[in-house]
Amino acid sequence: MNPFRILGDLSHLTSILILIHNIKTTRYIEGISFKTQTLYALVFITRYLDLLTFHWVSLYNALMKIFFIVSTAYIVVLLQGSKRTNTIAYNEMLMHDTFKIQHLLIGSALMSVFFHHKFTFLELAWSFSVWLESVAILPQLYMLSKGGKTRSLTVHYIFAMGLYRALYIPNWIWRYSTEDKKLDKIAFFAGLLQTLLYSDFFYIYYTKVIRGKGFKLPK
């Protein structure tokens, strides 16, 4: 069993549970990017279309895929539902969530056309999801950079998401050295890009949060 894969999945699962717990128990959505959460829902829906073929690698793999689709969609529903339960917070969230995601969608679509394993619908959808996931956090980071401060649980959520992607780099190295000696270059370089996007956040998280100072991204 690949320990880095398990740790990465646990970190990802933890990040989602942190966010759901935050929204459900406090109804506090300030600092959360609705656009990033919508992109993540799109990422997992397009990535795991192979569930419809019923060619599952393992029960664990299938259950994790279903969880990520359902949970990310549920987060979007919770955020959208705040329009009715907390109208002021919902409007403020949208007002600050101004990153133009059409650039990310078009860029990911183009990358999937140029970089894919096979020119089939499922493979193109998978490649699109990988490239989109690598940049889906940008609206959230952009929102934080504009606002400067945010709720600590949101910061911990972003850290857990970044850790999940960072752990997938040693996961690919482990698989290359112990399995078939084949490196999935699309997943590797997209994951590397995503980890680099988190690098500034990781540094500030360590210097400000871990060391007990207030969190604030540079504008």
From Swiss-Prot:
This is ER lumen protein-retaining receptor. GO terms for biological process: protein retention in ER lumen; protein transport; retrograde vesicle-mediated transport, Golgi to endoplasmic reticulum. The chain crosses the membrane at residues 6-26, 38-58, 59-79, 99-116, 119-139, 153-173, 186-206. One of its GO terms (molecular function) is HDEL sequence binding. It is a multi-pass membrane protein. Pfam families: ER_lumen_recept. Belongs to the ERD2 family. Residues 27-37, 80-98, 140-152, 207-219 are cytoplasmic. The gene is ERD2. Residues 1-5, 117-118, 174-185 are lumenal. Keywords: Endoplasmic reticulum, ER-Golgi transport, Membrane, Protein transport, Receptor, Transmembrane, Transmembrane helix, Transport. Required for the retention of luminal endoplasmic reticulum proteins. Determines the specificity of the luminal ER protein retention system. Also required for normal vesicular traffic through the Golgi. This receptor strongly recognizes H-D-E-L and weakly recognizes D-D-E-L and K-D-E-L. The lineage of its organism: Eukaryota, Fungi, Dikarya, Ascomycota, Saccharomycotina. InterPro entries: ER_ret_rcpt. PANTHER family: ER LUMEN PROTEIN RETAINING RECEPTOR (PTHR10585). Its main location: endoplasmic reticulum. GO terms for cellular component: cis-Golgi network; endoplasmic reticulum; endoplasmic reticulum membrane. It is found in: Endoplasmic reticulum membrane.
